[in-house]
Every structure is written in C-alpha cells, then in structure tokens.
Amino acid sequence: MKMVPGIQELRNLVVVRAGQSSLHNGWLAGQNERTWDLLVSYYDADAFGNDTSGMPKFFCAGGKWDGLFRTLNEAVDLSRYDYVWLPDDDLEASTQTINRIFELARLHNLAVCQPALTLDSYFSHIHTLTCAGFKLRFANYVEIMAPCLRRDTLQQLLPYVSNSKSGFGLDDVWCRLQPDNHKSAAIFDDAPVRHTRPVGLHLKSVVQQSGLSQEYEGAVLKNSFGFLDRTRPVCYAGIDSRGMMVNGPQSTGLRMALSHLKTWNKPPKNQQIRKDFFRMLRRQLIGTVDFSQIHLLPLKENDRKPASLSRQADNE
C-alpha cells in the first residue's frame, strides 16, 4: 500500500478532512513533542494547492466519511497504527491535548472514544461537554465529530462508509461492536477540545448537494448494519479527578449535573440549554444502557434501502 510521504509511523494517527478554514495547524503549535502522525486529507482543491507546510497531505473531494474511506485505503497503511483520531477541521486543540487523547485511549484499551468539548463550544449533545471533577466518563454514545478509534474497530466499520458523506448512524453502533461493551467507550474530560463553529453546517450542505439528507444517510447506514434503533446518550460510569471509580448512571449523572450547575452558578437561562440539561439528567436517572453486541451484516447486503425512507429520498 502506498504511504503519503512524511508519515513517521508513531503508532497513533490523526486524519483530518480539511477545507480553507481548517484549524489543524494550531494542533502543531507549542513545545510538546507529538506522539502521533498527522495526515491532512483535503476536500477543497484550493486549500490543497495552497498548503505549502510540508505536512503529509492528500486530496479527495467529497464528504467526511466517504473521503476518509478513500484516504485510509489509498494513503495509509493502517496496520502501522493502534489508534486513529478523526476530528472535524473546526476544532481547537493542542499537541498536548491530542497526546492525552491517545494516552487515555491506550491506557483503557477503548474501542472508541472522544475528547470532551469545552463549555464555550458549539455542541449537539450536552453529555459531551466537559465535567469538572472527572478524568473521563464511560458512555454508550460517542459523536462522529471527533472519534478516536482502535484499529480493529475502524477496520470493521470502514467498508460500510464508502458511500456515506456524513457518517450519520455510526454513533449509534460503534459503542456496541465488542463482545463485551462495558467500558469500551469513553469521553475524556481530561483532554477537552473547543468546537468553534455551529455543528454540521458544511457537511449538511455537501450531503444536500448529493440530493439526500444526513438523516437518510444515517438510516441507510444503520440498515446496512441490521440496526435501526436510536441510542440515547448515557454516561454510566467514570473516573474522577482523584482516580476513583464512579459507578452507575445515577451517581455519574448527579455529579455531571452538579458540575454544570457549579460552572453556571445557577440553572441556565437559555431555554435550549435548560431543556438539554434536564433531558440529560432524566436519562441519567431513569435511562437504560444496552451493552449487547451488534453484529454487522455482510457487505453484500449493504445495498438495501430502508423502506421507511425510500419515498423520502425520491421526493428530495
């Protein structure tokens, strides 16, 4: 397999799908030595042509996940890496933070994980916001925004995203691919990143240009997995800042709620954040977590369209 020149084989790999406004150069700033290789996979031809940084780069038009499929198949030898981080290009992070992501992933042998988001980030799920007092929280849901995947998990999923620009649906299944999924996925409060732009604006437009929707892509992808349920995020355990284990979604959720209330000083006035907060607390207190293994369907069955959305696709 051809490797893009400049990759150093550090056992950890970061691949970012990048455009004109990508923030990946900031990830290299500072004095900390990197424990990871970086490959910039450009979806924007002008950004690719204007990049004179000397960093390893690859051009591939398209969305995030179909582009990652091509990049990882054509420009990377995955057998050289234990973990691969696949962040969006609008995340602010430091070399030290990214080093810590890989350190925690390897320390806990996680199948999939993600950094928490700083409290001033744009976010989709409030449980991904950083919680003071935790090093990490074990969760049943990791976002597609910035997942870090163990090689075997990535290799298992990669063939299924060859035609998916958004990757919608991955976040519902990749925390349940192991024979034992308890504590196989986590969110790292000890390694937060800042999400600087409203969620999914560029990717949504790319998907719409193809005549589909992110929701349709998600249904198709989950249908190819033989799994159509929706995962409701719950953090069911954690490790606090003293290194002590916190067990159970109720105990974890109460600590999460107290952390946010202390940070905000009082319940938030923003109605959407207030709604998100109480939804999170309700799920933590009464929600359930399914640790059963999802078995992916053979790829030959991957062409089936979900009947419930076939008409929707025809009308878009």
What are the functions of these language-model segments?
Residues R80-E92:
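Short beta-strand-to-loop acidic/aromatic patch adjacent to the donor-nucleotide binding site
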Residues N25-W27, W36-D82:
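Active-site-proximal specificity loops/subdomain of glycosyltransferases
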Residues M1-V4, L10-E33, D46-G49:
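Short, well-formed alpha-helical segments that are part of the catalytic scaffolds
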Residues L13, S164, F168, D172-E316:
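C-terminal catalytic/acceptor-binding lobe
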Residues S94-D180:
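Conserved catalytic core of nucleotide-sugar-dependent glycosyltransferases
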Residues P56-K57, T130-G133, L203-V206:
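Short, hinge-like loop/turn segments at secondary-structure boundaries
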Residues N25-G30, T71, T97-L104:
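A short acidic, amphipathic alpha-helical/loop segment
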